[in-house]
Amino acid sequence: MGVARRLDDSRLRRLAYTRAASRLLGRTDATVGSACELLATAVDGVDGDRTVAVHARDVRSSAGVDTERAERLLGRVLVEAGYPVDLDDPDRELRALFTGDRCLLGWLVAESVRDFGTRAPTDRPFFQPGSMVSLDARAYANLAGAAPGQTILDPMCGTGGLLIEAGVAGSQVIGVDAQWKMVRGSRENLAAYLDDGFRVARGDGTRLPVPTDAVDGVVFDAPYGRQSKIANHTLDDLVEGTLREAARVAPRCVLIADRDWSETAATAGWQVDASFERRVHGSLVRHVHVLEERTG
């Protein structure tokens, strides 16, 4: 759960790990009584002809709150303020999030589209073991800047999972891979989900067939050294060389790997804007590096 200063409805619908966003009314202690007191002072009856509903959630059962009771009592506050209730098709929905010792109240603004299951790796025309799930691929594509009007490049595109999600988010996408098998498979997968706006070529990530400053963002999942062929490079040389090429063609890059490559990224000319880990299963933790062009 996080708080943002500004909300963009169209971007919210493309998010991966965020399910919904609300316009914050306020925050208080994680009790139903405190939530009702906050709501009573926050609502003013404006747009009182618009129907409402309440949805409460106890995040990971961390607050010990009876959410049905919370919905009932918060709904009573809204009725007393003059709002008609419609549980089936409300004009507005109040969200109450209880987490730990806090409660946040807000009017729902937008929900992200949860259709990732329709693009599961095993359901694509071309599949290889170890392919990234669509939910994670969308998150990393978003970090790279995937959006309408943007061009995203994956220099190690494999089966095309990252490019599919960047394309579904509205981007033009370019893929490069050293193996013809992957190039053909990626093209087949992209054609299954995107009408147009994609190109895939065989090439070397350390010598990209792309002009300087030609794309808006780069995103790639580096070989893990276990199931991936690395062609004629050592893994270290491949990752560093690809990062150098990424810095030539784009101002932003997202690198996903099974280890920390922050020092290599800095050597290749990038500034590490953020890094975090995401556990996939017991033997794999992904290291995600968000890289920005170095200034000054």
Please state what every model-predicted region is.
Residues 1-79:
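Non-catalytic nucleic-acid substrate-recognition regions in nucleic-acid-modifying enzymes
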Residues 84-88:
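Interaction modules related to DNA damage response and DNA replication/repair
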